[in-house]
Amino acid sequence: MKLPPFELHVPRTLDEALALRAALGSDAKVMAGGQSLLPMMRYRMLRPYALIDISRIEALTRFDAGPAVRMGAVVTHADVEHCAHPGPLFDLLRAHAADIAFVPVRSRGTVVGSLVHADPAGDWPLLLAALEASVELASLRGRRTVALRDFVRGAMDTDVQVDEIAVAAALPAWASGLTRWGRCKLMHRAGEFASASALAVQRADGRWTCWLGAIDPGPLELPATAGLLPPAGAARPTREEVAASALDEIRAARPHGDPLAASRHAQAMARAVEQAWQGVST
């Protein structure tokens, strides 16, 4: 299906983009990679009068390695997949990026675009929520930073205001010191959106954080399950115990959810934890 007619603006500076955003208001959409926006336009789910293509703004291409990692709005999945920075955090980021769709999508799709799209099945909302990321928003009124857990308000619903552009995603300094991680992404076929996904991360102080993705209305934290996981060297819960704890938390948080989906997510969490202990992440 062909795209509907629209007016295209290609600013070269952020100031120019923000001026366009303020002038065009709700009649315009901001596009970085277009891997979610353009298909929605083809199927007439969205019909903006204008697109503001920010992919040529050099200031938004920066990928700062830390100690507080920061990814500009035009940093693609492929940029993350092929980054050369060392350490467990970047091993996790690379593995996560490499598992997204196919090469053409990873070459155009952006990390921040995934957050703004806020599809519950998207990959980056899960990982960046678990790492306590924040989103930087800019407008002619100024800048503000919003924690990702507050930024995503629901399925495809975020805190971006009509005159704002999401310009970066940033990780806190503690994320650079994580010691181990495990992730699990269940798909019907390679390259598809996940039917269930899970992430377990251990911080430098030994504490764990456990999150689920591909679940409505957005990423779900499992603090009780994380509390079961001890520091390295201590007695570990069994896979069955992890799955049972996760299932209890899912049922409590989503009492009207699909029981089969809840079971899939619980098993994904158990696999993610198991891989974290083994030092194997797939």
Question: What function would you assign to each model-found segment?
Answer:
Residues M1-T282:
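C-terminal structural segment of proteins
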